[in-house]
Amino acid sequence: MKIDFLTLFPEMFQGVLGSSILQKAQEKEAVRFDVINFRAFSDNKHQTVDDYPYGGGAGMVLKPQPVFDAVEKLTAGTDAKPRIILVCPQGERYTQKKAEELAQEEHLMFICGHYEGYDERIREHLVTDEISIGDFVLTGGELPAMMIADSVVRLLPGVLGKEASHVEDSFSTGLLEHPHYTRPADYRGLKVPETLLSGNHAKIQKWRNKESIRRTFLRRPDLLKNYPLTDEQRKWISEWENE
């Protein structure tokens, strides 16, 4: 996979892309990152990329020219066009399902904006996806773009140590993940559940499933609305509702 980031602040990406899973993914040649300062594509001598909004108002708006030229140059000569992603509060809410969808692509391109917003022609004529990571405002699109890229890259084949790792993550199954414990079994009187020490894999799996359902019920009950609950799982929920 190839992932491009169009940004005015390329230095923001150095630590994230050069660390942890994203670094390992590059070493395994599962992904290639390119960080492009689209100011370099500005067609005026001062390399300005923003201007005042027509009709007045506060703030500055990103001009279409530098972004259009950057995208067109980066995609010239390629048959398969990338998914061009605009990260903005107006976009669709990002989910694990969307991450899985994007992980099937060969080329992603993020447009990371700043200032008051984008010229609408960027949104209408370049962008294939508008994505929001939540109902709050950030200074720019760099942090959301890195978050989305991280969630996508870890799904690529061979990136994680165990292929089952991401399948068991919260949201991958439609539920929040069950609790985890490691040694020691007794720390300051706080003990690991006996079931996990039993060696009985069937009991352990049932415990994990029940705790996953419980945690989802308590913290994100909205996720259960479309989850195909078994009769036993419905019984558990009924018991918790009556506690």
Swiss-Prot record:
Alphabetized GO MF terms = tRNA (guanine(37)-N1)-methyltransferase activity
Listed A to Z, the keywords are:
Cytoplasm, Methyltransferase, S-adenosyl-L-methionine, Transferase, tRNA processing
Biological process per Gene Ontology, one example term: tRNA N1-guanine methylation
What reaction(s) does this enzyme catalyze? Answer: guanosine(37) in tRNA + S-adenosyl-L-methionine = N(1)-methylguanosine(37) in tRNA + S-adenosyl-L-homocysteine + H(+)
What's the EC number here? 2.1.1.228
PANTHER family the record matches: TRNA (GUANINE-N(1)-)-METHYLTRANSFERASE (PTHR46417:SF1)
Its family remark reads:
Belongs to the RNA methyltransferase TrmD family.
Question: What's the protein called, per UniProt?
Answer: tRNA (guanine-N(1)-)-methyltransferase
Quote the gene name from the UniProt entry: trmD
